[in-house]
Regions:
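Active-site neighborhood of phospho(di)ester-bond hydrolases with catalytic His/Asp-centered motifs
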Residues: 61-63, 86-94, 115-118, 206, ...
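Divalent-metal (often Zn2+) His-rich catalytic cores of metallo-beta-lactamase-fold enzymes
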Residues: 244-300, 304
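C-terminal regulatory/interaction regions
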Residues: 293-341
Length: 341
C-alpha cells in the first residue's frame, strides 16, 4: 500500500473507531494493517498489544492482565475490523501479558489459537497459577494500603484519584479469584511463519532475555516488530531475566530490518531505541562488575552504579529510572555473587 492509501485507511480507521473515556487502550496506526494498542494507566497495569489485521483475520500480540482487559481490546478491534481474531500470541509468561488468554476462545470459539514459544507455555504451566496465588495473597495488603492513603489524603483531587485506584484494585482481585489460566495450544521452538495472502507474520524466539521464552512478532513487509518486554519504552523488569543473554538476544534482533517497535510498555519506538535499551543492560552489567571488583557492598553498588548510569539513560526511560534501577542493580549483583555469569 502506498503512503497516500495508507493515510486514507488510517483516517477511516480513526473515524470508525473513536476513542472513548471507557477504552482501556489507545489504538495507534503504525503501518498498513498494524496497530499499537497502547495501554492507558490502570491499577494493576495492562501491557500494550500489537494488533495485526491481515486478509482473513487478526493476530493480537499479548492478552493483558485479565480477561476483562482482553475483552475490552476485542471490542476496540471490532471498531476497526469485523474480521475474527485467529491468533493471540503470548510474548512471555508474565501475568500482565498472558492472564487474559481465556477471553479469546470465549469470544472466538474454535477459531483462535493461543501461540507461544515452548518455554513460555512451560513457564505458564509451572508458574502461572502460582503467580496468580501470589497476587491473591498480596491483594488485600495492597487494598489496605490504598485505604490508609485515602484516610490520610487532605487534597480532594488526590483522594479521588486514590479512590479510583482502590476501585480498580478491588475489581481486579475479584476477577482473578475465578481466573481460568488458558495455556497456549500452538507452540514453536525457534520460529513460526504465518504466510498470509497480504503479508508474512514471523514469530521468533531469538534467545533468552527478559524471560526464558521471549517471542518477537516480525512483519518484514510492514517493517514492524512487536517485542513484549524483551524491548520496550520503560525501565526493564529483570526478576526472571538472563542479563548477558538478553544483550545477545537484542543483538540478534538488531539484525532484522525494521523501523518501528511496539513494545510491551511505553510508546511506539524507532529502531534506534533498541541500541539504547541494549546499552543500558550492557552498561549495567559492566558497572556492577566494576563495583564488586572494588569490594562494594550491595547498598554501595546501588549508589555508585546508579550514578554511573543515570546521566546516559534517565531521560530515555519514561520517568521510571529512579524507581527501578536499584532492583536491576540488585538482580545483577546477586547473579554475579552466585557466579551465574
Amino acid at each position: 500500500m502506498n503512503r497516500a492509501r495508507f493515510a486514507g485507511a488510517v483516517a477511516v480507521a480513526l473515524i470508525t473507531s473513536p476513542a472513548s473515556a471507557e477504552d482501556l487502550f489507545d489504538l495507534k496506526p503504525v503501518a498498513d494493517g498494524v496497530y499499537a494498542a497502547l495501554a492507558r494507566p490502570a491499577t494493576p497495569i495492562n501491557c500494550n498489544a500489537a494488533v495485526v489485521v491481515y486478509d482473513e483475520g487478526v493476530l493480537v500480540v499479548d492478552t493483558h492482565s485479565r480477561p476483562s482487559s482482553a475483552r475490552g481490546l476485542i471490542q476496540q478491534i471490532r471498531g476497526v475490523t469485523d474480521k475474527p481474531v485467529r491468533y493471540a500470541v503470548n510474548t512471555h509468561f508474565h501475568w500482565d501479558h498472558a492472564q487474559g488468554n481465556h477471553a479469546y476462545p470465549v469470544a472466538f470459539p474454535k477459531q483462535v489459537a493461543i501461540v507461544a514459544s515452548e518455554a513460555t507455555r512451560e513457564n505458564l504451566k509451572e508458574l502461572g497459577m502460582q503467580r496468580v496465588k501470589d497476587q491473591l495473597e498480596a491483594g488485600p495488603r495492597q487494598i489496605a494500603a490504598l485505604k490508609e492513603r485515602i484516610a490520610a489524603a487532605t487534597d480532594a483531587t488526590a483522594r479521588k484519584a486514590i479512590e479510583g485506584e482502590l476501585a480498580q484494585q478491588e475489581a481486579y482481585l475479584a476477577e482473578i479469584r475465578s481466573l481460568e489460566l488458558t495455556l497456549p495450544d500452538l507452540t514453536f521452538d525457534k520460529s513460526l511463519i504465518l504466510h498470509r495472502q497480504d503479508r508474512d507474520i514471523v514469530l521468533l524466539f531469538l534467545g533468552r532475555g527478559h524471560t526464558s521464552g521471549d517471542v518477537v512478532a516480525y512483519l518484514p513487509k510492514q517493517r514492524v516488530v512487536a517485542t513484549g518486554d524483551l524491548l520496550h519504552g520503560w525501565m526493564p523488569f529483570m526478576g526472571d531475566s538472563y542479563p548477558p543473554e538478553w544483550v545477545a538476544t537484542l543483538d540478534a534482533l538488531d539484525k532484522l530490518d525494521f523501523d518501528h517497535i511496539v513494545g510491551g510498555h511505553g510508546g511506539v519506538k524507532p529502531k534506534s531505541h533498541l541500541r539504547f535499551f541494549r546499552d543500558y543492560l550492557a552498561d549495567l552489567i559492566e558497572a556492577v562488575r566494576a563495583a564488586r571488583a572494588r569490594g562494594e557492598t550491595l547498598d554501595q553498588a546501588k549508589t555508585s552504579v546508579a550514578a554511573v548510569l543515570k546521566p546516559k539513560f534517565d531521560a530515555g526511560m519514561d520517568g521510571r529510572f529512579d524507581g527501578s534501577v536499584g532492583a536491576n542493580i540488585e538482580k545483577v549483583y546477586r547473579d554475579l555473587e552466585a557466579k551465574k555469569y
